[in-house]
Amino acid sequence: MQTFNADLAIIGAGGAGLRAAIAAAEANPQLKIALISKVYPMRSHTVAAEGGSAAVTQDHDSFDFHFHDTVAGGDWLCEQDVVDQFVQSCPREMTQLEQWGCPWSRKPDGSVNVRRFGGMKIERTWFAADKTGFHMLHTLFQTSLKYPQIQRFDEHFVLDILVDDGQARGLVAINMMEGTLVQIRANAVIMATGGAGRVYRYNTNGGIVTGDGMGMAFRHGVPLRDMEFVQYHPTGLPGSGILMTEGCRGEGGIMVNKDGYRYLQDYGMGPETPLGQPKNKYMELGPRDKVSQAFWHEWRAGRTISTPLGDVVYLDLRHLGEKKLKERLPFICELAQAYVGVDPVKEPIPIRPTAHYTMGGIETDQQCETRIKGLFAAGECSSVGLHGANRLGSNSLAELVVFGRIAGEHATQRSLESAPANASALDAQARDVEQRLHTLMKQEGTESWAKIRDEMGISMEEGCGIYRTTELMQKTLDKLAELKERFKRVKITDHSSVFNTDLLYTIELGHSLDVAQCMAHSAINRKESRGAHQRLDEGCTERDDVNFLKHTLAFYNPEGAPRLEYSDVKITKLPPAKRVYGGEADAQEKSDKEQANG
């Protein structure tokens, strides 16, 4: 086993990982940084984000407005000091990306263009056509190449982190190209491994988004927080889960049922706004949890359209015109044509909700550090407390760079103040990781990782979907317990060294099963409806601030199901209130202004 000595190790080279690496390199030019990724950086899942990144930029917008939209959108489960820090940091990061070369779309006068996203009452989403994630990731990757102290380990799969005397001290990874192991020692480690959307059958996530970082931190005793909150995006393509960006609706797209009716006006997001009126009043720009829930009700009422790929509604962009679609949503036109054979210029796009984003994750403090000294987390794998029970669109790309920078700066400080590690203890841990890998490779079993993964995805969709019941969640919990037992009998049939995906998918599945259990156990024990967690059981259909205005913490239990604890939500300036959108929000805004003016 090779050994590489670094000061800081970063697991994941997407938006958060690259931003952390750049921040660390700028904080201390002498710092030796190891950047480990199981794919080439430009294949990280950040590249798939289409819509945009939030930051206050207009005169009629403010940090307070962004703060209010985020806290209300998260159904008051956000850590409000974290949200405050976030909204004030976003403009700096967007400007920094521009200075590094990110080609933000612009208005005719040359100023940065912004569009509105769901749940945001003011246009504040910066975008680069409909390939924002690609351009942000490319900009960060290009910028990272300026720093020779950042050493990349592309196509290296991290097997485990090393912890000595209560501090993260490195990791062990497998070089996928050669099949050899490498021990990377460091005084601090940052997890930037993305979410866990692949635990669901249909999802918008790339194949690499399997919850690896969450699973590793979890098994080392770090709790996973608020894992019951999994966002369904309302506009995925049927069958594939390919995302039709929220930017479609931000540009003025509408959603209709089989009767051509803009049905969202029946679910607290109306009244109907005539086409061509200010888009920030469009009912289609409600928060994602509520828009996805409206689809479920339309389906139950028989007002969706049946297709071979499942029931759908339509996303209609035709009234925007060919010129605007080709200029502002060119990638969407390509995707719709390629995956469902639809030209958005001429016909509506069939869509349905699909699993999209993990609001919960590795619990961290405001500096992105976990309960293990020197172990940090940033991006979708983390739970710093920003999103609460429902993330607003375009806050996630901004989160990557805001908290990627914070994690990089604080991990640098932690690394520099740390005493030397116990090398022999790290070597012993690394040998243990190697032995576990060999045991897995030689395991004589009868189970297939692919079959277990498929059954997990179906079960999670049935029990932990848009609407949940005790009965369905319990079935999912029972199924997951069965699958974890069967996982102990998985047989790896490929024993080659080079790009052994049979082995890698098996290891990923182990993490996914742990994460899925945390999601389901956290969900069945939250006996209320809040944000993306909606229950149909009697007594659980409403938000319950008295008993459940708190975070769920899932701790690893080697003997079975995760152990749950709860912690308070930090409320600093916006007390819990009813979430209102559409006409009801307009009426409240008018009333607030009248009261303010006496």
Curated annotation (Swiss-Prot):
One of its GO terms (cellular component) is plasma membrane. Gene3D superfamilies: FAD/NAD(P)-binding domain, Fumarate reductase/succinate dehydrogenase flavoprotein-like, C-terminal domain, succinate dehydrogenase protein domain, Succinate dehydrogenase/fumarate reductase flavoprotein, catalytic domain. Keywords: Cell inner membrane, Cell membrane, Electron transport, FAD, Flavoprotein, Membrane, Nucleotide-binding, Oxidoreductase, Transport. FAD binds at residues 12-16, 36-38, 44-52, 156-158, 212, 356-357, 380, 391-397. The active site is at 233, 249. Signal peptide: none annotated. The modification Tele-8alpha-FAD histidine is found at residue 45. SUPFAM superfamilies: FAD/NAD(P)-binding domain, Succinate dehydrogenase/fumarate reductase flavoprotein C-terminal domain, Succinate dehydrogenase/fumarate reductase flavoprotein, catalytic domain. Disruption phenotype: Significant growth defect during anaerobic growth on glycerol fumarate medium (a quadruple fdrABCD deletion); the defect is similar in strains also containing an sdhE deletion. It is found in: Cell inner membrane. It catalyses: a quinone + succinate = fumarate + a quinol; a menaquinone + succinate = a menaquinol + fumarate. Residues 577-598 are annotated as: Disordered. Its main location: membrane. Part of an enzyme complex containing four subunits: a flavoprotein (FrdA), an iron-sulfur protein (FrdB), and two hydrophobic anchor proteins (FrdC and FrdD). Interacts with SdhE. This is Fumarate reductase flavoprotein subunit.
